[in-house]
Amino acid sequence: MAIERTFSILKPDATERNITGAINALIEKAGLRIVAQKRIRMTRDQAETFYAVHKERPFFGELVDFMISGPVVVQVLEGEGAIAKYRDVMGATDPSKAADGTIRKLHAKSIGENSVHGSDAAETAKIEIAQFFSGNEIVG
């Protein structure tokens, strides 16, 4: 399996509860390396651009408001099959349906406040990474 990079966000519900270290430990335990990481406060424009794919969905406004409600941690993760591996580590969007031991089963508050985001495909990962990181910020 090829070494890949994927994009991750530790959302405001995670930073608010000071559980970013616990989430990072689960990421690293899964064999993924954190090759870039920074704590930011997303602007409304950043959140709307990032979640533009959901613009016509009824939850779009609430999602954007949530993502700008507090600091987030944006990350680039690297490892073999990183995209699929991180999606497995995150667990199902609905924490009640997430597998035991996953980030969302352990830490998510609800479907909306589900602690983490991860890219769903290689092309998406490239786009998402470029929205928040320049090349010299990614140190593998």
Curated annotation (Swiss-Prot):
Active site: residue positions: 117 (pros-phosphohistidine intermediate)
Name of the protein this chain belongs to: Nucleoside diphosphate kinase
Organism, scientific name: Rhodopseudomonas palustris (strain TIE-1)
Chain residues that bind ATP: 11, 59, 87, 93, 104, 114
Compartment(s) where it occurs, according to its Swiss-Prot or TrEMBL record: Cytoplasm
Cofactor(s) listed in the protein's UniProt record: Mg(2+)
Chief place of localization: cytoplasm
GO cellular component, one term: cytoplasm
TM regions (residue ranges): none
Keyword flag Plastid: no
Listed Pfam families: NDK
GO molecular-function terms, A-Z: ATP binding; metal ion binding; nucleoside diphosphate kinase activity
InterPro entries: NDK-like_dom, NDK-like_dom_sf, Nucleoside_diP_kinase
Keywords of the record: ATP-binding, Cytoplasm, Kinase, Magnesium, Metal-binding, Nucleotide metabolism, Nucleotide-binding, Phosphoprotein, Transferase
Entry's family note: Belongs to the NDK family.
Reactions performed catalytically: a 2'-deoxyribonucleoside 5'-diphosphate + ATP = a 2'-deoxyribonucleoside 5'-triphosphate + ADP; a ribonucleoside 5'-diphosphate + ATP = a ribonucleoside 5'-triphosphate + ADP
Function of the protein: Major role in the synthesis of nucleoside triphosphates other than ATP. The ATP gamma phosphate is transferred to the NDP beta phosphate via a ping-pong mechanism, using a phosphorylated active-site intermediate.
PROSITE patterns: NDPK_LIKE (PS51374)
Biological process, per Gene Ontology: CTP biosynthetic process; GTP biosynthetic process; UTP biosynthetic process
EC number(s) from the headed UniProt entry: 2.7.4.6
UniProt cross-references to SUPFAM superfamilies, sorted A to Z: Nucleoside diphosphate kinase, NDK (SSF54919)
Assembly information from the UniProt record: Homotetramer.
PANTHER family: NUCLEOSIDE DIPHOSPHATE KINASE, NUCLEOSIDE DIPHOSPHATE KINASE DDB_G0292928-RELATED
